[in-house]
């Protein structure tokens, strides 16, 4: 077990105990107790990520910047191990799972499990998008041509690691900054056709649309 796993477990236990480890129904469809042990030497915890990329214990009554997880090592460990939940437990309600030894960390999300929060500029490399509070440790190359503005909800999406669903949400503040680079055609006033980036006019591929629209709602 990596050192961060112990920190993850201990922090979750403290928070769960502070809430009296109550049984809860995070989305009105499933009951659980934070830190429950369905099998010997196995613990289960339940998390939620919002549209700003903030991670919380799922049963937290108050979800805001003060109550979200901020420890970098914890966030990197959690999100770098995120996978689709094929465990046979809570699959419908918590579609993603982060394993840490015998610790199961189930995740549900407001929109997508990966939320891009910052565009990291570099003099020597192409820009990278950082997600879910992980800084440089959780970052992928920025692909401006593959940005997907979705008119149905007014949100912006970008490719994400395949293990985390392949599509990530761009946080609203960052999406607003990037929207200044969009170019709209005369026949499409609501959906951009190109993006102006680093002196180039780049056509948007829209190739993420089938993958995003085919995904079940969280």
UniProtKB/Swiss-Prot annotation:
It comes from the Eukaryota. Belongs to the UPF0598 family. It comes from Rattus norvegicus. This is UPF0598 protein C8orf82 homolog. It holds the Pfam family DUF4505. InterPro entries: DUF4505.
